């Protein structure tokens, strides 16, 4: 009886370890080879989240972590680096003080930003991670966040 229980527990542990290894070593999604869900103007994307956050979240974001791949077009308002050394481009309407779209590049695609200057019109492909938000009580704004970005044009 004890050997049957021991064998059953061993089989369950082996299956669990196999599943964990499968999940751990599964290849990451290649955003640049994935077909884009839509091409959107940066200001239009921000306005969608500000007008109806729930509808925009349902359209662009996925609770399972497979958020949509978008191509965002807009005017470069700012170029910076984050704490990890990844370059970040803020796409924003120059005449608008509202939020914009923050596009974070990977270390592999950082070099694509070298020839881009503030004021340029660009198309950037990436995964949307968060929508624009405005907190009236604290007067705080949050840009739309696009990760794993790459310049298209």
Label the predicted regions.
Residues 2-153:
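OB-fold and OB-like single-stranded nucleic-acid-recognition modules
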């Amino acid at each position: 009886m004890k050997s049957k229980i021991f064998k059953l527990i061993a089989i369950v542990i082996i299956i669990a370890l196999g599943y964990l290894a499968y999940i751990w070593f599964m290849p990451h999604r290649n955003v640049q080879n994935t077909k884009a869900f839509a091409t959107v103007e940066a200001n239009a994307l921000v306005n969608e989240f500000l007008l109806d956050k729930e509808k925009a979240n349902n359209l662009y974001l996925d609770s399972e972590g497979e958020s949509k791949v978008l191509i965002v077009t807009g005017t470069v308002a700012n170029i910076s680096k984050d704490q990890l050394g990844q370059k970040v481009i803020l796409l924003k309407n120059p005449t608008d003080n509202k939020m914009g779209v923050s596009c974070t590049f990977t270390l592999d695609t950082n070099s694509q930003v070298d020839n881009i200057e503030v004021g340029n019109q660009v198309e950037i492909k990436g995964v949307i991670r968060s929508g624009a938000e405005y907190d009236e009580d604290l007067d705080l704004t949050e840009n739309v966040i696009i990760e794993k970005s790459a310049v298209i044009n």
